[in-house]
Amino acid sequence: MRYNLSNICDYVKGKIDVAVLDEDKYISTENMMSNKGGITRAASLPTVIQTQAFLPGDVLVSNIRPYFKKIWFAEFDGGCSNDVLVFRARDGINKRFLYYVLADDAFFEYSMATSKGTKMPRGDKAVIMKYEVPDFTYEEQEKIAGVLEALDKKIQLNAEINNNLAA
């Protein structure tokens, strides 16, 4: 059986004062890395008073040009640009499992196919929540997320080793 994304998560709507943020705690589309590469330090903070808030365990996805596949599993609390979608897993949904559902290339392809605009396509927030996801028990979600997280850690370790060899 399959569900819509809206059955397993919600968009976060909370705000945070920019005054309590620094460049390490602010995420925008500019400091999200392409191809699921995580984040870097922001170059600057926005000039607005408040921005969208996120918490550890939330999943942040750039909503501009989805083909860049910019996604990050939040490891700390902070604030982000309005061009970044913040997803929060509902009760009974494993947070890492949600991350891997959204990190799947099929999600980015769906987001592009249903996006609006040509030069700077944006995902349609209402349609994104209709993305179909498989129905797994919490225990199955934990197992799937555990295997994928172990693979991600191995890939990251191999990349660090390669960088050290190149240096």
Predicted region positions:
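Sequence-specific dsDNA recognition surfaces
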Residues: 4-56
